[in-house]
Amino acid sequence: TARDAGVGFILEAPTWRANPDWGAKLGYSPEALDAINLDAVALMEEMRGEFEMPETPMVISGQIGPRGDGYDPGEIMSVEEAQAYHDRQIAVFARTNADMITALTITNTAEAIGITKAAQAAAMPVVIGFTVETDGCLPTGQTLADAIKEVDDATASGPIYYMVNCAHPSHFEDKLADGGDWKNRLR
C-alpha cells in the first residue's frame, strides 16, 4: 500500500459514469447524480481520514468519464458543448473537499478542452487522461504530443498534468522516445 511504501496516494471518487447521459440510462435524475457525486467524495474523505499519515498525503479526486465510449470518439462535441455537458458534475465536486478533477479515457481534444474550461470556471485543478490506441495515437488519429499541445494552447496550459490510461505501455513507449517538451506534461 501507499502507506507501507511511504508515498502519497490519489483517492479517485468512483464517479466515472456519474454524468447526465449515463445517469439517464439508469433512470437517475440530475439531482440524484449530484447526490451520488457528493456521496462518493464523502466516502473518499472517510478513507483519507482513516488512512492518511503526514508522510503519506492523500489527495481526493472527483473522477470524470467521457460523454461517450472511452475508446471510440463517436460524434465529437464542440468545446462549448463539452464544457456545458461536464459543468454540473465539476461544479458539484467544487462544493466538496475534492482537491482536483481527473478526466479519464478522454478520446478527443474538444472534450478535453471543454472539461478543462469547466474546471477552470469552478477553480478546480484538473488532470486529463487520454486514451491511446496501439499506435500511440488518440482514437481520433491525433498524436499524443499534438493533443497535449492543442489543449494547452486552448486553455493556457490549464491541466496540472496529463496522463495516459487504459493502454499498455508498449502502445506509446516509442512516442516517448521522440523529443519534445510535451513529455514534461505527462505524469
What are these regions (language model features)?
Residues 1-187:
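Domain-level signal for soluble alpha/beta catalytic cores
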